[in-house]
Amino acid sequence: MLQVYNTLTREKEIFKPVKEGEISIYACGPTVYNMPHIGNYRTFLMTDNVLRALEYLGYRVKLVMNITDIDDKTIRDSKAAGMTLKDFTDKYTAEFFKGLDMLNIKRAFAYPRATENVDGMIELARKLIEKGLAYEKDGSVYYRISGFPEYGKLSRLNFDNILIGASVDVDEYDKDNPRDFALLKASTPEEIERGIYYDSPWGKIRPGWHIECSVMAMNSFGPTLDIHTGGVDLIFPHHENEIAQSEGATGKPFVCTWIHGEHLIVEGEKMSKSKRNVFTLPEIVEKYGGEVVRFMFLSVHYRKKLDYSEAFAENAKNNYLRLKETLDNLEFSLKGADDKSYPGDLETLKALPELETQFRHALEDDFNTPRALTVFRELSRTANLYLEAGKNRKVLEKVHTLYRKFSDVLGLFAQAGKEEIPEEVFRLVEEREAARKKKDWGTSDTLREKIRTLGYIIQDKKEGPNVKKAEES
């Protein structure tokens, strides 16, 4: 039974989708004004983990992630770069997708851009004005938060602190100073000169940040969606304002379950440019590899802060490589498998269903990937114990199938097995194993060298030889 922690209720709840068997997810995507740092990608990976787990659990899932390509930051920084807003945001949108590929993050069903949905934003603002929940002032349109009594229910804001009639134009502001926020902003003369404006009943405007997500989410799924994901930093004001806009307009619940990922910190401190501890994803991937970074993120529950350090990353790398080595051993051993019976056959086959049950329960418990990795390591141990003496084809195939199922759900080892070990190398390894059993060490060394000249290395382990391409060592 799937249980998910809901930020709205601050409780772990039994999850029930709006439509049985189908799940809608809207994820706050990147604001494309710079290279996203590793903390941003931790949140994107959290959404990917939720998607993969739900699919494994048998749901049909539709994920939509937005691209914020017009807001205060994109306008400011595109000007500083001397680029048009579109050219500037296209550049960083491309970088965002490169990062997804580095981490083997599955593509969403759609990536709507804010600039493609402005008509819907103008319509939502008009509807809110009609309901008395918004008003025009100096060419901008503001949301009247005093008109929505439930304002603050997500962030647990004290409604008594609301400043009646006070408004704020910036997209991000403090929880202790809640004000009427801008739905649509009057374009400045400079923005109009740069072509950053849209015609509306209130003049030339451009959208505020918060209305963008309300419109793109409801355009994708209607008034109510199952899950909305994002980082904890978005709870206020962004997600709070999404609720006010959407529910104020429709009178229906906007999101059933809110899922928020905690911060990534660096050696106990918040990332900041002044401390020179802000790392982009390419920097970390170049050092450790994309799958190691993914493994590192998986090893800490999404609702806990991840404290990044080189020691932590090295530990993740070592654990990842141990699991990868087991997969390599399994796939190599399958080439030499037979139909004989071995002492560990029944015990190994008996262990597999229980391990999958444990793996499933881990994911059903609020997408607990650290616990799922613990089960994965136990499967690795079971596989290695069997490989020490057994090579029954049926057993190896079942172990390998479950191993691959776990790795696919966790998004690991995507490239493993795509390049087959050449038949010539496999034959030489078999000949070398035969020589080793006869203690013919001279022939064994000669064959090792032949294997090396073909671009592969061999490592002798108690569970059998491990063959890798030379550059992987």
Curated annotation (Swiss-Prot):
Keyword Cytoplasm: yes
Assigned EC number: 6.1.1.16
SUPFAM superfamilies associated with the record: Anticodon-binding domain of a subclass of class I aminoacyl-tRNA synthetases (SSF47323), Nucleotidylyl transferase (SSF52374)
Enzyme class: ligase
Keywords annotated in UniProt: Aminoacyl-tRNA synthetase, ATP-binding, Cytoplasm, Ligase, Metal-binding, Nucleotide-binding, Protein biosynthesis, Zinc
Subcellular location: Cytoplasm
Short sequence motif 'KMSKS' region: positions: 270-274
Sequence positions that bind Zn(2+): 28, 213, 238, 242
PANTHER family cross-referenced by the UniProt entry: CYSTEINE--TRNA LIGASE, CYTOPLASMIC, CYSTEINYL-TRNA SYNTHETASE
HAMAP family the UniProt entry points to: Cys_tRNA_synth
Protein name: Cysteine--tRNA ligase
Ranges spanned by the short sequence motif 'HIGH' region, renumbered to the chain: 30-40
NCBIfam families registered for this protein in UniProt: cysS (TIGR00435)
Record Gene3D superfamilies: Cysteine-tRNA ligase, C-terminal anti-codon recognition domain (1.20.120.1910), HUPs (3.40.50.620)
Cofactor remark: Binds 1 zinc ion per subunit.
GO biological process: cysteinyl-tRNA aminoacylation
InterPro entries assigned to the protein according to its UniProt record, in alphabetical order: Cys-tRNA-ligase, Cys-tRNA-synt_Ia_DALR, Cys-tRNA/MSH_ligase, CysS_C, Rossmann-like_a/b/a_fold, tRNA-synt_1_cat_dom, tRNAsynth_Ia_anticodon-bd
Reaction(s) the record says it catalyses: tRNA(Cys) + L-cysteine + ATP = L-cysteinyl-tRNA(Cys) + AMP + diphosphate
Obligatory cofactor(s): Zn(2+)
Single GO MF descriptor: ATP binding
GO CC, alphabetical: cytoplasm
Statement: the UniProt record of this protein carries the keyword GTP-binding: no
Residues where ATP binds: 273
Family: Belongs to the class-I aminoacyl-tRNA synthetase family.
